[in-house]
Curated annotation (Swiss-Prot):
Its cofactor is Mg(2+). It catalyses: 2 (2R)-3-phosphoglycerate + 2 H(+) = D-ribulose 1,5-bisphosphate + CO2 + H2O; D-ribulose 1,5-bisphosphate + O2 = 2-phosphoglycolate + (2R)-3-phosphoglycerate + 2 H(+). It comes from Bixa orellana (Lipstick tree). This is Ribulose bisphosphate carboxylase large chain. Heterohexadecamer of 8 large chains and 8 small chains; disulfide-linked. The disulfide link is formed within the large subunit homodimers. The basic functional RuBisCO is composed of a large chain homodimer in a 'head-to-tail' conformation. In form I RuBisCO this homodimer is arranged in a barrel-like tetramer with the small subunits forming a tetrameric 'cap' on each end of the 'barrel'. Keywords: Calvin cycle, Carbon dioxide fixation, Chloroplast, Disulfide bond, Lyase, Magnesium, Metal-binding, Methylation, Monooxygenase, Oxidoreductase, Photorespiration, Photosynthesis, Plastid. Binds 1 Mg(2+) ion per subunit. The modification N6,N6,N6-trimethyllysine is found at K5. PROSITE patterns: RUBISCO_LARGE (PS00157).
Length: 466
């Protein structure tokens, strides 16, 4: 075999191609690379491209049997990270043919697989991915999307309200159902299974599904509004998960739930297909995300996990609350919130968006703000997230001194007051506390909630309107 030369050669000779013009069909990745001391950035970037595509550590005879130029990943641009020593953003282009159609699992196995244990790198983080329409079109995506969900629920022009039922573990099915009923009757749109409520000895899944369905129908009959409870179908096997989803459909409930990272993308995509085929909405919880996305220099940013979920399928996903966080973090959160909801998102490095993303007609996902929020946060949340969001108050509903239903009333009154104020042209950023105070004058439930959680010392600037 002519021209085969055994031995180890530098990656950059093959995989670093600064002159490469990216194709519209390429999947593009932005990696934050921290090379080991003495490893030049070109070699590190090329190593990432090689190890996440066609390369291996030594030249192999079988390379001659295929066209490497057609299939290899290419590191096409490298830039140093401002303010960091020896850290670079390396841009890698992958040819479309490297990935199985409609499989987030396969995409991640390549792009964030073995390469993350690579010795020449001290650390590696995937910051963003550009998914080309040629690839995204091979996915079903979210079962229904934002507009279809609004039509199913007949709720328009405001964020939706939810509540995670607490204590998350230990209630019997009957008491759990009662807690759901109280919240829904009080004015919430949804109640939620906690992510770790699956099927434990104190409450088996089937009993919970039954009592929660009863709660939904009773609350619907009393309020004249459509209600839902996120029934967590997450299970130890895919078969068991599907069995739970089927039972939910038989009960006629509107929505089920899945923990997509612990459950896995393969299970999630199967469930999303079932949900579209059977008219179920799908709520997604991101338990385990911080294991992957919390380190600044290693792992994968949540915006990548969010894009992956939009491909795999989900109608709601937890996306942080922004409230009380730093300004920069707000921009970055809103960056991936837009990636979840919008059709077309421009590249904007100040919001952490490394690539222009065109989803074409893939349905959007509703971001869910949940965790440590209460009535005083309502103006900020309405302003930051806008109408296409779900605001979830667990303790902020169930912690009300008069009980669950009054807690739900307080949240609904606060929300309606904020939406009305916004529609009248008032500035929620500056008048938020005032709006809540006014509303509490004619709602004793809200007044009691305001008293418990007192005004929070939280001044937030109006967002830059572009």
């Amino acid at each position: 075999f002519v021209g085969f030369k055994a031995g180890v050669k530098e990656y950059k000779l093959t995989y670093y191609t600064p002159d490469y013009e990216t194709k519209d069909t390429d999947i593009l990745a932005a990696f934050r690379v921290t090379p080991q001391p003495g490893v030049p950035p070109e070699e590190a970037g090329a190593a990432v491209a090689a190890e996440s595509s066609t390369g291996t550590w030594t030249a192999v005879w079988t390379d001659g049997l295929t066209s490497l130029d057609r299939y290899k990943g290419r590191c096409y641009h490298i830039e140093p990270v401002a303010g960091e020593e020896n850290q670079y953003i390396c841009y890698v282009a992958y040819p479309l043919d490297l990935f199985e159609e409609g499989s987030v699992t396969n995409m991640f196995t390549s792009i964030v697989g073995n390469v993350f244990g690579f010795k020449a790198l001290r650390a590696l983080r995937l910051e963003d991915l550009r998914i080309p329409p040629a690839y995204s079109k091979t996915f079903q995506g979210p079962p229904h999307g934002i507009q279809v969900e609004r039509d199913k629920l007949n709720k328009y022009g405001r964020p939706l309200l939810g509540c995670t039922i607490k204590p998350k573990l230990g209630l019997s099915a009957k008491n759990y159902g009662r807690a759901c009923y109280e919240c829904l009757r009080g004015g919430l749109d949804f109640t939620k299974d906690d992510e770790n409520v699956n099927s434990q000895p104190f409450m088996r899944w089937r009993d919970r599904f039954l009592f929660c369905a009863e709660a939904i129908y009773k609350a619907q009959a009393e309020t004249g509004e459509i209600k839902g409870h996120y029934l967590n179908a997450t299970a130890g096997t895919c078969e068991e998960m599907m069995k739970r989803a089927v039972f939910a459909r038989e009960l006629g409930v509107p929505i089920v739930m899945h923990d997509y990272l612990t459950g896995g993308f393969t299970a999630n995509t199967s469930l999303a297909h079932y949900c579209r085929d059977n008219g179920l909405l799908l709520h997604i919880h991101r338990a385990m995300h911080a294991v992957i996305d919390r380190q600044k220099n290693h792992g994968m940013h949540f915006r990548v996990l969010a894009k992956a979920l939009r491909l795999s399928g989900g109608d709601h996903i937890h996306a942080g609350t922004v409230v009380g966080k730093l300004e920069g973090e707000r921009d970055i959160t809103l960056g991936f919130v837009d990636l979840l909801r919008d059709d077309f998102i421009e590249k904007d490095r100040s919001r952490g968006i490394y690539f222009t993303q065109d989803w074409v007609s893939l349905p959007g996902v509703i971001p869910v703000a949940s965790g440590g929020i209460h009535v005083w946060h309502m103006p900020a949340l309405t302003e930051i997230f806008g109408d296409d969001s779900v605001l979830q108050f667990g303790g902020g509903t169930l912690g009300h001194p008069w009980g669950n239903a009054p807690g739900a009333v307080a949240n609904r009154v606060a929300l309606e007051a904020c939406v009305q104020a916004r529609n009248e042209g008032r500035d929620l950023a500056r008048e938020g506390n005032e709006i809540i105070r006014e509303a509490s004058k004619w709602s004793p439930e809200l007044a009691a909630a305001c008293e418990v959680w007192k005004e929070i010392k939280f001044e937030f600037e109006a967002m830059d309107t572009l």
